[in-house]
Amino acid sequence: MCTGICFTDNVGNLYFGRNLDWNAPFGERILIMPKGYPLAYSFLDDAPSAHAAIGMGIAYKGYPLFFDCGNDAGLAVAGLNFPGYDQYERAPVNGKANVAAYEFPEWIAANFACISEVQTALENVAIVGKPVSEQLGTSLLHWIISDAKRSIVVEYMADGMHVYDNPVDTLANQPTFSFHLENLRNYISADGAFPEPAKWRRAELAPSGSGATLRGIPGDFYSPSRFGKAAFLKAHYPAKDTESENVARMFH
């Protein structure tokens, strides 16, 4: 199960995070990719990293396989599980910049400084389902990418690449991002405000406790439920001033 969100503080600093819940460890650890680090791509020309990046993932024969990361320009990316919907290219596509799925996060972090640059580059990109090795296989993912101004979601399916503006700065797992956005309409009656007492004929009805502000917001671990809850909390959580308070906000 994966859920990711991002937000900025009162002075424009980006906070970007996700959970990564597996039933077994992969040996993941903190990875640091220095600026100028040589990257040997599967289909693109080898090139040094234009940006330094730090994130979580595994290293395979000196190659950083980021699950999520952020670079020195303030651009961040995370891959979240998306089985049953994603469909990468089986082979490189002529006339396209072909990026192997396992390379996608580090390719983003190594080469771009903002969402606008990423969107321009993605207009000519094909994502190829080539695994880094036969032992590791290919992860079935979609991605949230963010800078301090906005975020996007990238999904690669049978009909090609989809790049969505992400107005709620949230992502979970399958189904598609467009489904998750549409599903939020089920919760529009929850506005984060404490309800006033109601009168039904002679009965005076007051809310039962402070949790009434979340009435109707799902609390289970199903992907659409996690997306709905995370998007709601992200939108209604009070703004904070300090770094420690905003880190706590991310974990909450």
Regions from the PLM with identified roles:
Residues 1-96, 129:
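A contiguous strand-loop segment
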Residues 1-15, 130-131, 138-139, 148, ...:
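C-terminus-biased signal that marks the final domain/tail of proteins
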Residues 8-11, 71-73, 146-150, 155-160, ...:
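Short acidic-glycine loop/turn motifs at beta-strand connectors
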Residues 13-26, 94-108, 225-236:
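N-terminal short leaders/motifs
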Residues 23-43, 161-191:
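A short, surface-exposed interaction/processing loop segment used at functional sites
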Residues 69, 82-83, 90-92, 121, ...:
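Peripheral peptide segments
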Residues 95-131, 243-252:
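Proteins synthesized as precursors that undergo proteolytic processing into mature forms
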Residues 115, 119-156:
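Aromatic- and glycine-enriched pocket-lining scaffold segments that form the walls
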